[in-house]
């Protein structure tokens, strides 16, 4: 049994081995067949691809050959065209050269003819000169001198006539242009101002107030007149009192103080002093505001505060009845407009025009003409040299060296000379009153002085610590003599010297 089993196992092994061998050989043959099939297919594909590539290469070569042949044909055609154009140009140049040669030959012939004619003309000219010398008995040089002299006289006469015509034309054109510039400036500067007066009227609530203003034995009215330096005129005019004085600042102080007293109702010397001080401060503020408004109206910035204050004081100054501040504003506008027309520095012209009369704001207190005072003030407060020069030149105290200085001078003359701008009589009257005060203030010991009663009286306040009661009589006499020597006036002037000693104490 065991042997049989072993034989069976061996036979099974052998059969399995043979079966696997047969299967393996079959797979190998199948693989070989598949490999041969794949190889043959690859060879066929490669052969097909080769044929395709060869075909494409042949087509590309054919296309490139066709393009190259076309390009060669095009280049050949272009060369043929260029050759044709060159041939045409050569033919044209040949023709031009031939024409030029013909013209040169013709020109040479003409030059020869001209040379022959010139020689003939020269001979004829020489013969004419010889004949003229023989007939006139003058040599060539003598005849030339006579001819030149005659021609020179004619030319000089023509030149003189021409120069005269040009001068007249230039003057006419300059005058027309100047009139045009000035008329344009005047039309564009629409300024209006009324003539200043020397009186102010204060309205009263009733006529009983007149008695309160006068006060017991006139002490209130005397205090007002003494503190303000004006005349207070109380007459039959209903419900009104008149403040008269040539200094507008004093008159304004008196007006404001009186209106405040009337409004307050308490009128006595102590209250009057208080209100006058308040009025002075209010007028100072008005002066600063007027200066600032003037600078703003003209368009000027950067003025020193002291110049602003002095400008404001010009509001209370008059020149021949014309308000000096309004006059200065008008001059600034006119000078600026004319500067714009001429292409000059309009800002310098306007600034100098506004400040040209600044010296009039202080010429009561400082000696010298207002032009020099104004220039000194402008220099002190750091104005430019151009502005200072224009101020100095506006009355020809110095020769104007700049266009702006000339324009300020012209604008000043235009503003002052237009009809209705100024009144001589009023200015002469004010100057006479001003002169009276200057004479009184020139004496030692005088504290202040006021010309009142339309210049028929001058009241002088003296310092009691310097002038005693005996000295005031001599002082009044000396002032009277000086007035007689230096001032022309009708009638007589009353000189009143007041010495007042005030002692103040308090009861505790």
Swiss-Prot record:
GO terms of biological process kind: mRNA catabolic process
Enzyme Commission number(s) from the entry: 3.1.-.-
Gene Ontology CC, one term: plasma membrane
Keyword Hydrolase attributed: yes
Domain called KH: residue spans: 198-261
Recorded GO MF terms: RNA binding; RNA endonuclease activity
Keyword Transferase: no
Domain of life: Bacteria
HAMAP family found in the cross-reference section: RNase_Y
Function, as annotated: Endoribonuclease that initiates mRNA decay.
Family note: Belongs to the RNase Y family.
Protein name per Swiss-Prot or TrEMBL: Ribonuclease Y
Source organism of the structure: Thermoanaerobacter sp. (strain X514)
Species lineage: Bacteria, Bacillati, Bacillota, Clostridia, Thermoanaerobacterales
